Design a protein with these regions (language model features):
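Short gly/ser-rich loop at a beta-strand->alpha-helix junction or flexible surface loop bordering the NTP-binding
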Residues: 2-194
Length: 194
């Protein structure tokens, strides 16, 4: 009896359903039919993949000029979105050197990158001085572990990591890239340090 009921049910289904493509197993292959979607009916779903936004060329140029170091303000000001910045940091493509300061090439930061980082933390008028400037002027042979940065007297910064901030009321004009104290000032500072 069970066999008879199965046959009747199959006969009814065959009468009411249109002929569907069949798989090799004899099952309907309706799931394999691709129906083009109307683009106007697409909705956003969580987890949907979006094309990655690239880093703006101006930002890449600035990073190259600054030994692969950028501030958060520079990145956002030159067109990077907060979400792209977040992705670069979470995927460790960019690494933080300090709060709001990033190394952008995915490798360990070089001394030059750390020097630029200190200048950027120090602000618009900051410049390398003493042994750090002496190293860049090629009168101090080895890059110093502590990078000394000259800042205006009114700027208050705590020394941190490899950076020592030295305040002065008589800030000389900087030169070079990264900004550093002029050669005569650097020589005098090094003579006084010894």
């Amino acid at each position: 009896m069970a066999a008879a009921r199965g046959s009747i049910a199959e006969d009814r289904a065959a009468q009411t359903l249109p002929d569907l493509p069949q798989c090799a197993s004899g099952r309907s292959a309706i799931h394999s039919i691709a129906v083009p979607l109307d683009p106007s009916r697409r909705t956003h779903h969580a987890g949907e993949v979006h094309p990655r936004k690239s880093i703006p060329p101006e930002l890449r140029r600035l990073a190259a000029e600054q030994a692969d170091v950028l501030t958060r303000e520079q990145a956002l000001g030159l067109g990077l979105t907060r979400s792209v910045l977040h992705r670069l940091l979470t995927q460790e493509i960019w690494t933080p050197l300090a709060s709001g300061l990033y190394h952008t090439n995915g490798t360990r930061a070089s001394w030059q990158s750390l020097a630029w980082g200190g200048v950027l933390v120090g602000g618009d008028q900051a410049m390398l001085c003493r042994r750090a400037a002496g190293h860049l002027w090629a009168i101090h042979p080895d890059p110093p572990e502590t990078i000394q940065i000259l800042i205006p007297d009114e700027v208050r910064l705590q020394d941190r990591d490899c950076w020592q901030f030295i305040r002065t009321r008589n800030l000389p004009g900087s030169t070079g890239s990264p900004p550093r104290s002029p050669l005569p000032d650097t020589v005098l500072d090094l003579c006084l340090d010894d």
